[in-house]
UniProtKB/Swiss-Prot annotation:
Full protein name: Phospho-N-acetylmuramoyl-pentapeptide-transferase
Gene Ontology biological-process annotations: cell division; cell wall organization; peptidoglycan biosynthetic process; regulation of cell shape
Lineage: Bacteria, Bacillati, Actinomycetota, Actinomycetes, Mycobacteriales
Highest taxon of the lineage: Bacteria
Gene designation: mraY
Keywords: Cell cycle, Cell division, Cell membrane, Cell shape, Cell wall biogenesis/degradation, Magnesium, Membrane, Metal-binding, Peptidoglycan synthesis, Transferase, Transmembrane, Transmembrane helix
Length: 359
């Protein structure tokens, strides 16, 4: 537990201190955000706000993760694990794709970065690499970071994927989550605040998996997860970095995370869900992100098939703005919904464990 607190503290400190430095740097260089040309009129005042704050988030996550491990190793503990490094590697590669996208937007002074093909290729590369490596690095207990068995709160033994199908599954999961967080990042602090809650929930889940791991505490309800404590450190560092960034990103935002941050954070959810064997449970925890990306899909399908739009604008947080909700109302209400979803997800996780142990 001490290492988890250290990861949170370091990540928060790095993020909250580095972000204002980025604000000054990007402002001096004139690297301001361009808004959607068809976006809500109230967003016009956001033009010119520095972007690419995801650099501070990623720096905070890595600092929190590595810093907690330095302390742990000084006390005789283990170093970074394959699972933790795979998740952070996935997030970093996706963040790199987002960084290129952000830079192109800023250079062109338009809200148009990488074309869809280039962006998809970048996400595909990250997902395939993650999927292939997730089935490697078998430890002494025979566990790999990922599992070919589909998982709810633990592996579903009746649904086993061939290695190639598992990699394809990872492509779907990574693409879905990275795009979901990307679409959610449209209001000041919305994505950062929601992400902090989801990863905080994952701290509880993965730490519980660590305390009830089959490798150290075999018995009813134990979990076959390769590196649950390390995943808790990744989740804790992410939560801390998001809170630190939120200090500057809360309405009215002084900086935006950009695709650098949103794609990376989507990678965090995707990576942790796969390596903690909770791919289906993640849909409950990240219900806001799921709803946001679903609204975009529904809007596109409805318009192409009927010529009519379901929402005034998608992602649907903009719909609520256009029907009269203030931006801060949308943000706070969506945060509340995220808190409820995370509470429900943790309750489902714990309830399944109680059932497994016969309580």
């Amino acid at each position: 537990m001490m290492l988890i607190l250290i990861a949170v503290g370091i990540a928060l400190a790095v993020s909250i201190l580095l972000t204002p430095a980025l604000i000054r740097l990007f402002t001096k260089q004139g690297l301001g955000h361009e808004i959607r040309e068809d976006g809500p009129p109230s967003h016009a005042k956001k033009r010119g706000t520095p972007s690419m704050g995801g650099v501070a988030i990623l720096a905070g996550i890595w600092a929190g993760y590595l810093g907690s491990h330095l302390v742990g190793m000084a006390m005789g503990g283990d170093g970074p694990s394959a699972s933790g490094l795979l998740v952070l590697g996935l997030a970093t590669v996706l963040g790199g794709v987002g960084f290129i996208d952000d830079m192109i937007k800023l250079k062109r002074a338009r809200n148009l970065g990488l074309n869809k093909t280039a962006k998809t290729v970048g996400q595909l590369f990250a997902a395939v690499l993650f999927g292939v490596l997730a089935l490697q690095f078998r430890n002494g207990d025979g566990l790999t970071p990922g599992s070919a068995e589909l998982s709810y709160v633990r592996e579903i033994a009746t649904v086993t994927l061939a290695p190639a199908l598992f990699v394809l599954f990872c492509v779907v999961v990574v693409s879905a989550w990275s795009n979901a967080v990307n679409f959610t990042d449209g209001l000041d602090g919305l994505a950062a605040g929601a992400m902090a809650m989801v990863t905080a929930a994952y701290v509880l889940i993965t730490f519980w998996q660590y305390r009830n791991a089959c490798a150290t505490a075999p018995g009813l309800g134990c979990y076959n997860v390769r590196d649950p404590l390390d995943l808790a450190l990744v989740a804790a560092a992410t939560a801390g970095a998001c809170v630190g960034f939120l200090w500057w990103n809360a309405a009215p935002a002084k900086i935006f995370m950009g695709d650098t941050g949103s794609l990376a954070l989507g990678g965090i959810i995707a990576g942790i869900s796969v390596t903690s064997r909770t791919e289906i449970l993640a849909v409950v925890l990240g219900a806001l992100f799921v709803a946001e990306v679903t609204s975009v899909v529904v809007q596109i399908l409805a318009f192409r098939t009927t010529g009519r739009r379901v929402f005034r604008m998608a992602p649907f947080h903009h719909h609520f703005e256009l029907v009269g909700w203030a931006e801060t109302q949308v943000i706070i209400r969506f945060w509340l919904l995220t808190a409820i979803a995370c509470g429900l997800g943790v309750a489902l996780f714990y309830g399944e464990w109680l059932t497994a142990v016969g309580a």
